[in-house]
């Protein structure tokens, strides 16, 4: 029952339950975030948040044409997406989304926007790294086996991300390694 409150912007006060249980149930671990969305490493699936209520997003109901669609891969990463009230239609039971054309278009449009901006968001996450090596460590922690964004590894392979060092040199990061063919001597 506590899971219902996990993504509320302000959690209610709970009585009759241990503080550690509440903390554990409401724990959100934001790995990366963009405008109106974030990846939560504790999420078992992706959710559309509308009016503090988390609605699971079904990739099946979005009718992706193929398994390798980047938007489908994004949903496998536990992405939490905020929507204004009324942008998505909900079922009569108010427990799930209705996958009408309007709701599907809103979801697909937002997913495309996130995928399009993902390289910039990820490059921003690496911007505070002092060295190439620090950036490589973070990159591998996120995208390597067991990393919180492992589901996005195929998306990253397609769109690519880069790290710019303090001297302005841009390092292209691909397939869990850096493009060292161009900069090998500078490592």
Task: Describe every region a protein language model picked out.
Residues 2-109, 115-116, 137-186:
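GHKL/Histidine-kinase-like ATPase module
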Residues 125-139:
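Short, highly charged C-terminal tails/helix-capping segments
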């Amino acid at each position: 029952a506590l899971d219902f409150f996990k993504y509320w912007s302000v959690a209610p006060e709970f009585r009759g339950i241990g503080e550690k249980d509440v903390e554990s149930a409401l724990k959100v671990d934001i790995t990366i975030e963009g405008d109106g969305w974030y990846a939560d490493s504790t999420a078992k699936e992706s959710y559309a948040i509308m009016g503090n209520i988390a609605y699971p997003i079904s990739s099946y109901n979005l009718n992706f044409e193929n398994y390798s669609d980047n938007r489908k891969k994004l949903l496998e990463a536990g992405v939490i997406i905020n929507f204004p009230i009324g942008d998505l239609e909900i079922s009569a039971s108010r427990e799930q989304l209705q996958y009408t054309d309007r709701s599907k278009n809103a979801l697909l449009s937002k997913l495309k926007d996130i995928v399009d901006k993902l390289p910039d968001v990820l490059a921003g996450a690496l911007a505070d790294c002092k060295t190439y090596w620090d950036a490589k460590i973070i990159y591998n922690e996120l995208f390597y086996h067991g990393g919180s964004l492992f589901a996005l590894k195929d998306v990253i392979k397609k769109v690519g991300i880069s790290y710019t060092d303090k001297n302005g040199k841009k390092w292209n990061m691909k397939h869990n390694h850096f493009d060292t063919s161009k900069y090998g001597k500078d490592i």
